[in-house]
Amino acid sequence: MDYEFLRDITGVVKVRMSMGHEVVGHWFNEEVKENLALLDEVEDAARTLKGSERSWQRAGHEYTLWMDGEEVMVRANQLEFAGDEMEEGMNYYDEESLSLCGVEDFLQVVAAYRNFVQQK
């Protein structure tokens, strides 16, 4: 899972992720927005879940983060729709709406993001 952190001309941090993990970048850009307290909450949840059968979820405005002791799922909230809403022959492109990754990989991105934000 490759990632890149950038600052736009206003100084706001933007995250770009590799193909297949774009939604993780969108989660940082839309939900975190340099809110380190949210990252604290996610890291605390990961520590609590490690070695357990439980799961944790944080629904945001645009994206929901779900995790258990082994993996993290980020999905767009708009992804919930009935299958019969699609026209016949059409497929829903969800590469940028759903992503799964390991907890350790995700926490590495969280730590790198935190370090980048604090370098102002």
UniProtKB/Swiss-Prot annotation:
Q: Which InterPro entries match?
A: UPF0231 (IPR008249)
Annotated coiled-coil segments of the chain: none
Pfam families for the chain: UPF0231
* Family according to the record: Belongs to the UPF0231 family.
What is the name attached to this protein's record?
UPF0231 protein YacL
